[in-house]
Amino acid sequence: MTMGEKIQLLRKKQNWSQEILAEKLSVSRQAVSLWERDESQPELDKLLKLAKIFS
């Protein structure tokens, strides 16, 4: 499973839209979309926030 697939899976388990996750991370919805398609990777600070949000 790729990082993007994992982000998408965790987001969907929370029943969140990409927009909701983006707001929680202070990024654009497009950034979340790129991550989920593995076209971009979150920066370290965003990875740490993702870990906190989904733990």
Per-range role (PLM):
Residues M1-T2:
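A detector for short, charged/polar N-terminal pre-domain segments
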Residues E5-K24:
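Short basic helix-loop element that most often maps to the first helix and adjoining turn
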Residues I7, Q18, R29, L44-L47:
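Helix-turn-helix DNA-binding elements, focusing on the entry/boundary residues of the two helices
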Residues K12, A22, S33-L34, D45:
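Alpha-helical and His/Cys-centered functional microenvironments
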Residues D45-S55:
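DNA major-groove recognition helix of helix-turn-helix/homeodomain DNA-binding modules
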